[in-house]
Amino acid sequence: TIERLLRHWADSTQRGQPDDEALHMARFSLHAMATGGIYDQLGGGFCRYSVDDQWMIPHFEKMLYDNGQLLALYADAAFATGDGVFRRIAIETAEWAMRDMQSPAGGYYSALDADSEGEEGKFYVWTPDAVRAILTADEYNMFAPVYGLDRPPNFETASGPSLARGPRTRV
């Protein structure tokens, strides 16, 4: 749908009657996905879907084919709009795929399971104490409000990889 919105906007622009509403819907959706819980803010790449209606908690599985399609979509959106956020997301998604999904033999793995060592999202969530252990006090004070560590956890007993923000408009 987002790809179709971008193509429609590009076609309408070439005809001299740009459909700005189509562009707005595409940009809004892409930004919401990039700042919500399905995008891995630290490692890059997208989780398969969200398990809550605010798009803050991902199902921690990452599929190569989903990320390939999203990489192409964000690259196209960056090219069409000049939006630096879309460019960054495309680059980070490509870097994630090459770093984490490529096998030593040169092929690619199809997915990363949501469960690690018998625990869902084990390597995608953190506690304030775990973050304090690796950051200085000043770094933690900047990091915590951005990633929601100054509030109750958003996933079981820890917090997941979404940018913190106030109430959202539904996507």
Q: Where are each of the predicted segments found?
A:
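Glycan-recognition and catalytic cores of secretory/periplasmic carbohydrate-active enzymes
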Residues: 1-171
